[in-house]
């Protein structure tokens, strides 16, 4: 049996930018001295005249992008999630969010799967921060196919978009020939009647694996992929909650303010349902291999399976 192909979504980001650059001369890419890591170097090599390296000055990069967007350009700013959502939050809020400018924020190295770089570089709070900015779209793709489609959709969308990419290579779960991406629309990847698993980003493939383990125990889990955390596909989540009666959210992010909180907000208003949030439990990350960190923070498939099995019982 052949192995499932795996690609890091940061690679998908760089490749998608280069592809879009062929078609759209108004697309410009800005980076903060991390083009090799964020993979925007692919775009830089193809279109050096449309690439701006702002150095280690993320706040300035954000302001430059805001200015470019008022001149007919569609800028994508790029750095680690910690350095844009964290360090440059004020500028993202005031220079991009407040005037609702057409700037795309492509961040990489989100979550604990940054690995050996450690807690200072592992941004587990970015989704929570970005959710508070009015009008900010938040996309967290699950694989290469979805990530490349998300970059294209972000370019076509008029307004600020926050894109979250990772360092860890992820299994490809979508068929490129048939996959259709739409901002704000989740998808059911697996049907089930006993519990609904709502997952995002790197946790989608682990959740699918956990669902297979649950099935062996006679527990049928519905698995929903939420690539767009804001605006959330509330209708899909509410209908699923009504069908299964229990919901589990899974994210490589703090359980405070991320996907789990968004789902709970929706269900509290429209269909109160027991919810278990699986994510980073109000703690910082640490240095270590990505796969080992997922195990320690109980975000690997086996841990997800065990938690859901106990929750359903």
Language-model features: locations:
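Thiamine diphosphate
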Residues: 1-164, 169, ...
């Amino acid at each position: 049996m052949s192995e499932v192909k795996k690609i890091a979504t940061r690679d998908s980001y760089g490749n998608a930018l280069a592809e879009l650059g062929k078609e759209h001369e108004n697309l410009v890419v800005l980076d903060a001295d991390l083009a090799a890591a964020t993979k925007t170097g692919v775009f830089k090599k193809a279109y050096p005249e449309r690439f701006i390296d702002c150095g280690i000055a993320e706040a300035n990069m954000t302001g430059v992008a805001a200015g470019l967007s008022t001149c007919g350009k569609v800028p994508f700013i790029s750095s680690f999630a910690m350095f844009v959502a964290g360090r440059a939050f004020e500028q993202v809020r005031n220079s991009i969010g407040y005037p609702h400018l057409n700037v795309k924020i492509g961040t990489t190295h989100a979550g604990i799967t940054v690995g050996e770089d450690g807690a200072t570089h592992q941004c587990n709070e970015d989704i929570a921060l970005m959710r508070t900015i009015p009008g900010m779209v938040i996309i967290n793709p699950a694989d290469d196919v979805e990530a490349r489609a998300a970059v294209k959709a972000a370019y076509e969308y008029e307004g600020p978009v926050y894109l979250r990419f990772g360092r860890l290579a992820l299994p490809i779960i979508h068929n490129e020939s048939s996959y259709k991406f739409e901002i704000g629309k989740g998808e059911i990847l697996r049907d089930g009647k006993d519990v609904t698993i709502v997952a995002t980003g790197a946790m989608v493939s682990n959740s699918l694996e956990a669902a297979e383990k649950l099935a062996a125990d006679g527990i049928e889990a519905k698995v929903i992929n939420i690539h767009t955390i804001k605006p959330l596909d509330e209708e899909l989540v509410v209908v699923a909650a009504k069908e299964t009666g229990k919901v589990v959210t899974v994210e490589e992010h703090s359980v405070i303010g991320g996907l789990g909180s968004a789902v709970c907000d929706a269900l509290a208003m429209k269909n109160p349902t027991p919810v278990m949030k699986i994510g980073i439990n109000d703690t910082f990350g640490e240095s270590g291999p990505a796969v080992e960190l997922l195990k320690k923070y109980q975000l690997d498939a086996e841990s997800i399976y065990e938690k859901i099995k106990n929750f359903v019982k």
